[in-house]
């Protein structure tokens, strides 16, 4: 065959006609090389992802500033009610009229872009109401006081909050731990509504109730992966000896008509209690757990400080301040400055290795 081809080549131009098998092998090897190169490039891109900035993929990337919404208040102020004592069992102040606000609550609010005015519960009622006129929302903290003057002041402030919302002003309230418990007592009109639970100094999950609608609630802007983490990881801090079981909560018409249950949790003995509620008709959210501790308290080893736990704290703080920005209250700036928390200095109490790291003490 070779001789015939060579011989023919002497007489005329030779054309090479490869066999089909040869063509198949050539194409197959070429395809393998192409695919190999392609997947190598994909692997390299995945190992070192190229993060494109907006100017790299937007044709018109000329900068433009987002217009301010004139309906929103971009200087919101939150009032935090002080609690009896010094927050350290008398180690920092044994004054009989002492009250305190843990600095973690202040930082919690400030981290979301608001300022704080302390509402000192022992002040005359007219002074407390004057301070309410300077703020765009209120936070009731954790603690132990469930009777006497403190209970009475919480009740009166809560009534004012509802009145302002009924009058058309958006005026949010957060109630944490003790705040949750006192609100439950006030709304249910039952001082004995609470039940004992074994949930002191422990981290836990949050279990969302079946078919719950989180639209408009504190959880609305949580990313899906974080909602899942709340149900699978112990990333919220619990520290309470009382609470309300879902059954008792639902049986009380006043409570169930005012609040919807968003989440439940289990105590050490696996008893289920209501852990997060949202008012049906008001911007009022109550937590049996402590959203402020994950980022701002270090006194106990069981406080979760993972990235997910810190993210929970930030989202919860953002929701409160987002609601406060909707408040139509625009108090005089100088009046706010005269009452703002910056007029006070926090006291470091963390040297004992337990309790609050910092507290604001008022006497």
Whereabouts are the PLM-identified features?
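Active-site regions of oxyanion-processing enzymes, predominantly non-cytosolic
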Residues: 286-287
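N-terminal beta1-alpha1 cap of cysteine-dependent amidohydrolase-like domains
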Residues: 2-282, 291-363
